[in-house]
Amino acid sequence: MSFWNSLSITTRYSRLPRCFFTYVQPTPLDNSRWLIWNSELAKQFDLPENVHNHSELLDAFSGEVVPSVFAPLAMKYAGHQFGSYNPDLGDGRGLLLAEIKDKKGNSFDLHLKGAGLTPYSRSGDGRAVLRSTIREYLCSEAMAGLGIPTTRALGMMTSDTPVFREGYETGALLIRMAETHIRFGHFEHLFYSNLLEELKLLSDKVIEWHFPCCLGEDKPYLAMFNNIVDRTAYMIAQWQAVGFAHGVMNTDNMSIIGQTFDYGPFGFLDDYEPGYICNHSDYQGRYAFNQQPRIGLWNLSALAHSLSPLIDKSDLEKALEQYEIKLHDYFSQLMRKKLGLLSKQEGDTRLFESMFELLSQNTVDYTRFMRVLSDLDSQDKQTVIDLFVDREAATLWVDLYLTRCKLEADSFDMRCSKMRKVNPKYVLRNYLAQQAIVKANEGDFSDVKILSTLLASPFDEHPDFERYAELPPEWGKRMEISCSS
């Protein structure tokens, strides 16, 4: 029996009507070889922890030999890109290979990114380059390490295939896993194409596969949308709390289950700059860090419009009204945890706001500040105050914070121990990713492997790797990244 036949693999998406996808065979790269295999993730699916002597895995994920249990397909969807509707979207470089169940019985998509041309490639070549593949692998695993809902990366390959972008780069492959690759844009495609029966079918399948709790509801489609609103609010609250800027929040990059999706020109905050723009194509700052909560609502409104044949307008409006309430509640809960506060007090929102104002006015590194604050039990308050130019204002805030901490039952030691579990020491700063990419292009993958290890446990000290927690050099701050992949 084939290795693949021994696993719990299905292809349920391929049973949908053909307006949802096109069957496409992957086009292999030249001399594909493993760069990283995520052994910890592999274990959850009974996949081998070591791939170096496992030719069937290499053959399948490089596209050389497609197992009979796979049904490779390119999904069709649409979406609003920078606010404008584009009907001509779909998987232009990636293929959904199959779905595989983990040890708990949960289904995950196996998706191959960089697999070659599809009918939706438009002017692209269907390839992914090493640079963008490294960025997506590292960031998806970094987000998982931070506890933020995200797609995952099972592995990546490099090759001998040259791919032209601004210049020639190395072709690469990413094996992405997600509970679903269904996006807001899938619903938009069906709605704007007037495929209303198919829109209902997709909604039924999304409920069956991802929101079975909605099956018994009087209004199951509304219940589904309420769940999407809730998960989106939670995801974006997590982004704002950790200082993550996605960079390209088009509706075709929004997961219907609230997972961070499609890592392109992302960035983590260095200095706390609310208006930080990480995408150099975002000339108007539509997707700036401080605009992400607003764009989340805009995107949900676009999805609501696409669901209007199934859900009453008044119900959709009420559901959308809950978004900002949920986002605020989730964000407040997360910030209390980051500050070691267990109880909810009336002045907490002002405490958070004054902290952000102070960080912004003094251009203080956000990750470093939160981590230093987590060590306040073993340092005097001056260590925190010295992070600021305006030490007088910083002293006032720290005193206010310490007064607030006295309302908690936890000791300082216990509070700080909890804070160190939610305030990371290591995040994927863009300059670190760039340094790893430069080395990788020279054949040295050591930084990629070190970062993948550190970012899997970002709250731990890792004393031998302190340099990866250092503040960025001036050239490494405010890096704007291209969408080119």
Swiss-Prot record:
Binding positions (ATP): G90, G92, R93, K113, D125, G126, R176, R183, D262
HAMAP family on file: YdiU_SelO
EC number: 2.7.7.-, 2.7.7.108
Record-listed Mg(2+) binding positions: N253, D262
Function field: Nucleotidyltransferase involved in the post-translational modification of proteins. It can catalyze the addition of adenosine monophosphate (AMP) or uridine monophosphate (UMP) to a protein, resulting in modifications known as AMPylation and UMPylation.
GO molecular function: AMPylase activity; ATP binding; magnesium ion binding
Residues the record marks as active site: D252
Keywords attached to this entry: ATP-binding, Magnesium, Manganese, Metal-binding, Nucleotide-binding, Nucleotidyltransferase, Transferase
Protein name: Protein nucleotidyltransferase YdiU
UniProt cross-references to NCBIfam families, sorted A to Z: PRK00029.1
Keyword Metal-binding belongs to the record: yes
Catalytic activity: L-seryl-[protein] + ATP = 3-O-(5'-adenylyl)-L-seryl-[protein] + diphosphate; L-threonyl-[protein] + ATP = 3-O-(5'-adenylyl)-L-threonyl-[protein] + diphosphate; L-tyrosyl-[protein] + ATP = O-(5'-adenylyl)-L-tyrosyl-[protein] + diphosphate; L-histidyl-[protein] + UTP = N(tele)-(5'-uridylyl)-L-histidyl-[protein] + diphosphate
Family assignment from sequence similarity: Belongs to the SELO family.
Listed InterPro entries: SelO
Required cofactor(s): Mg(2+); Mn(2+)
Domain of life from the UniProt record: Bacteria
